[in-house]
């Protein structure tokens, strides 16, 4: 019997086992059954359309009705080969016929090189391969537009595309797996350009789940969880900024950062509204950068963005991805750098997201002692798996390239570095050398940092890392992790402990303000007064200050001046720049009304504005932040008076003398050693009346004489206002 004879009548159907897998949604190659297949002098077209009442193949001007065989499978044998093109006309009960190209007529949209690079973990533009991508193909019957879908699920028994386009039916759009790659793929013609979709995954554990696309560029607004097909037609206007970025080294430049939670800065604003209002505010306040709490999509607003489910999608709460691009663009055109918080340490266990994606531990480590973060109830990425490492490294590059982000602040680095992080004895598995270091996480961080700085020169990567791990900001080629900077958590804790004490007791804790200089140049530091310090019952910076409102305001002003004068870059969480009194909550906006009700808030806000202006104009405050040449003590030991004083030096030869009186009383006739005689101008006095202070000071400057003091050749006699900071420069 010839092949053509077999393909008649009941022989149009595939083998029963093949048919059973197709109906069950567990066929690994539905394209091998569906679509057009040539057999000697016949061509068979099969279409799997459950719930359809009629399917017709349109070949040129000819119509061929497909026979319904079983369970929604339709087929017809055409009496010729070399079929060039065709369309399917599908009719559902109660609906008009609609004509579409056959999805199972198209070749794979991924190439062997892409799959090879992914398997090795080295595809630097992986987001262009996996996920959902609108495409067009030219065929004999015209251009076919649609969307190609690709998802990695190597252990799945089957994967189908579901969405609004098919009524979330898991049968009509089964996907094929591309060899040993574990990538399932399908091109679907006429898919809506902003259509919602998920993947129905038949897991290796026998459980069927509907999953959001790990590479989705867009999502439904939470709490809805579907992915959305998204493409960009945004035209950037920040060419000058991007060209300049490639030439910069942020470590040696001014960097004062305003940390923002977009949803509660001013509730109700979209990305494009923020592009106007937030940009104007940051420019007015003089910050050089803004750092956004995680903007990647997250279902639970109470996580502040730190439990991410869609790593490639800006949250849809405030608009589209192009709307987010507009926000970044506006900030760049105003001269503001943009940093985003990035969370590669862990991810939530939501059943529709990454966890046990194909019925096995896929993105997470298979050993529960390594694959779960007990404190947060989340999964930990398997940093040693090439495809997972590629998912994360490519994600970092995606934000830097596709959204022009200037920096990534990597969250919870300590939890990545240590296998025993927050684990009880016996609750962790040592590395191959018997140690507690997570060697795979170390290698991942090194690869991420090296690749990010190679692909996007001039960007900054910042580690939130609170342990003594050595070499966090050391280059990877000499064994470091390769971060540009790390948060100085020790400085933050010591400083806040000190300033929260009554001035009467501060002299006994003077070391808390001097200890940071013992290690200030061991890494490249950011000095954070972040969101973590104004939540969970910690109050606010204002609330930590002792005394009445006048004393609290003076304390906060002196703290901020100390932060900006200390070696390191600055980060300040929103609301603290005007002394917000209520603890922050993501559920409500900042207390902007304080600026209308009391002068203290206005004074603090103006101080921050002036400090930023002075900071940018004085390289002594930033150009040698990471070297001992940029700093020297004038007097570190005046604990009796609660006074600290030091010099800052710039790479241009500039100098700045900084004096801090943390006592509750003023000091008159306070002699300060200086490097040269002559007039020294008071560029900052935090007790000035313009900041709602008491107005005690030095009438704008002092005259230094050739009287040695503090081991220096000259000195000047100053008045130090209570709880204040003075900055002086040669006139």
UniProtKB/Swiss-Prot annotation:
Description of activity control: Is inhibited by divalent cations such as Zn(2+) and Cu(2+), but not by Mg(2+), Mn(2+) and Ca(2+). Is not inhibited by several known inhibitors of the GH13 family such as ADP, ADP glucose, tunicamycin, castenospermine, nojirimycin, or acarbose.
UniProt enzyme class: transferase
Pathway annotation from the record: Glycan biosynthesis; glycogen biosynthesis; Capsule biogenesis; capsule polysaccharide biosynthesis
Annotated Gene Ontology cellular component terms: cytoplasm; cytosol; plasma membrane
Catalytic activity: Transfers a segment of a (1->4)-alpha-D-glucan chain to a primary hydroxy group in a similar glucan chain
Keyword Repeat: no
Domain of life of the source: Bacteria
Record field: temperature dependence: Optimum temperature is 30 degrees Celsius. Loses 20% of its maximum activity at 37 degrees Celsius and is nearly inactive above 55 degrees Celsius.
Stored SMART domains: Aamy
Phenotypic effect of disruption: Disruption of glgB is lethal for the bacteria in vitro. Affects the production of both extracellular alpha-D-glucan and intracellular glycogen.
PANTHER family: 1,4-ALPHA-GLUCAN-BRANCHING ENZYME
Function (record text): Essential enzyme that catalyzes the formation of the alpha-1,6-glucosidic linkages in glucan chains by scission of a 1,4-alpha-linked oligosaccharide from growing alpha-1,4-glucan chains and the subsequent attachment of the oligosaccharide to the alpha-1,6 position. Is involved in the biosynthesis of both glycogen and capsular alpha-D-glucan.
Additional free-text comment from the UniProt record: Cysteine residues of GlgB form structural disulfide bond(s), which allow the protein to exist in two different redox-dependent conformational states. Although the conformational change do not affect the branching enzyme activity, the change in surface hydrophobicity could influence the interaction or dissociation of different cellular proteins with GlgB in response to different physiological states.
Family assignment from sequence similarity: Belongs to the glycosyl hydrolase 13 family. GlgB subfamily.
Protein name per its UniProtKB record: 1,4-alpha-glucan branching enzyme GlgB
Organism: Mycobacterium tuberculosis (strain ATCC 25618 / H37Rv)
């Amino acid at each position: 019997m010839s092949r053509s004879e077999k393909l008649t009548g009941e022989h149009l159907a595939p083998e029963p086992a093949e048919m059973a897998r197709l109906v069950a949604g567990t066929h690994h190659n539905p394209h091998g059954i569906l679509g057009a297949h040539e057999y000697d002098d016949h061509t068979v077209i099969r279409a799997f359309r459950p719930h359809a009442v009629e399917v017709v193949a349109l070949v040129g001007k000819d119509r061929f009705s497909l026979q319904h065989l079983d369970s929604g499978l339709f087929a017809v044998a055409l009496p010729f080969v070399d079929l060039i093109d065709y369309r399917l006309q599908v009719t559902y009960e109660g609906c008009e016929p609609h004509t579409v190209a056959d999805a199972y007529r198209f070749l794979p949209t991924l190439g062997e090189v892409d799959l090879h690079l992914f398997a090795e973990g080295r595809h630097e533009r992986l987001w262009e391969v996996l996920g959902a991508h609108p495409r067009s193909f030219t065929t004999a019957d015209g251009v076919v537009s649609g969307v190609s879908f690709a998802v990695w699920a190597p252990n799945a028994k089957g994967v189908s595309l579901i969405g609004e386009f098919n009524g979330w039916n898991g049968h009509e759009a089964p996907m094929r797996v591309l060899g040993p790659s574990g990538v399932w793929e399908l091109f679907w013609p006429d898919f809506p350009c902003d259509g919602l979709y998920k993947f129905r995954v038949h897991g290796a554990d026998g459980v069927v789940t509907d999953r959001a696309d790990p590479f989705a560029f867009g999502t439904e607004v939470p709490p809805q969880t579907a992915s959305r097909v998204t493409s960009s037609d945004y035209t950037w206007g920040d060419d000058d900024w991007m060209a300049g970025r490639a030439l910069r080294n942020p470590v040696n430049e001014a960097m004062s950062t305003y940390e923002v939670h977009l949803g509660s800065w001013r509730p109700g604003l979209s990305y494009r509204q923020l592009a106007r209002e937030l940009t104007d505010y940051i420019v007015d306040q003089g910050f050089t950068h803004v750092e956004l709490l995680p903007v990647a999509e997250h279902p639970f607003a109470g996580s502040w963005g730190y439990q991410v489910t869609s790593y490639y999608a800006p949250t849809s709460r405030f608009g589209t991805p192009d709307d987010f691009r507009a926000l970044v663009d506006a900030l760049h055109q105003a001269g503001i750098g943009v940093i985003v918080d990035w969370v590669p340490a862990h991810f939530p266990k939501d059943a529709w997201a990454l966890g046990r994606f194909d019925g096995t531990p896929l993105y997470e480590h298979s050993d529960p002692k390594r694959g779960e973060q007990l404190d947060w109830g989340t999964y930990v990425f398997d940093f040693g798996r090439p495809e997972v490492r590629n998912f994360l490294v490519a994600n970092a590059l995606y934000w830097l390239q596709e959204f022009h982000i200037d920096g990534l602040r990597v969250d919870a680095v300590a939890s990545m570095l240590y296998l025993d992080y927050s684990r009880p004895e016996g609750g962790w598995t040592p590395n191959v050398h018997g140690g507690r270091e997570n060697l795979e996480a170390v290698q991942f961080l090194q690869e991420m940092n090296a690749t990010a700085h190679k692909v996007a020169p001039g960007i900054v990567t910042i580690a939130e890392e609170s342990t003594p791990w050595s070499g966090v900001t050391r280059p990877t080629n000499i064994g470091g992790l390769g971060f540009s900077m790390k948060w100085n958590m020790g400085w933050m804790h010591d400083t806040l402990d000190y300033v929260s004490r009554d001035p009467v007791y501060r002299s006994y804790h003077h070391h808390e303000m001097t200890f940071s200089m013992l290690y200030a140049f061991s890494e490249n530091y950011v000095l954070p007064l972040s969101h973590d310090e104004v939540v969970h019952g910690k109050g606010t910076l204002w609330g930590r200050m002792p005394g009445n409102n006048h004393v609290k305001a003076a304390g906060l002003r002196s703290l901020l001046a100390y932060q900006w004068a200390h070696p390191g870059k600055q980060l300040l969480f929103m609301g603290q720049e005007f002394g917000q009194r209520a603890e922050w909550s993501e559920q409500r906006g900042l207390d902007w009304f304080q600026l209308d009700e009391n002068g203290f808030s206005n004074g603090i806000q103006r101080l921050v504005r002036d400090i930023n202006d002075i900071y940018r104009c004085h390289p002594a405050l930033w150009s040698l932040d990471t070297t001992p040449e940029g700093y020297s003590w004038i007097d570190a030991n005046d604990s009796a008076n609660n006074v600290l004083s030091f010099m800052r030096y710039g790479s241009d030869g500039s100098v700045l003398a900084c004096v801090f009186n943390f006592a509750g009383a003023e000091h008159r006739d306070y002699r300060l050693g200086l490097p040269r005689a002559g007039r020294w101008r008071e560029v900052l006095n935090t007790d000035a009346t313009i900041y709602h202070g008491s107005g005690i000071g030095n009438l704008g400057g002092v005259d230094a004489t050739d009287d040695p003091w503090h081991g220096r050749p000259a000195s000047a006699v100053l008045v130090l206002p209570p709880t204040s900071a003075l900055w002086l420069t040669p006139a």
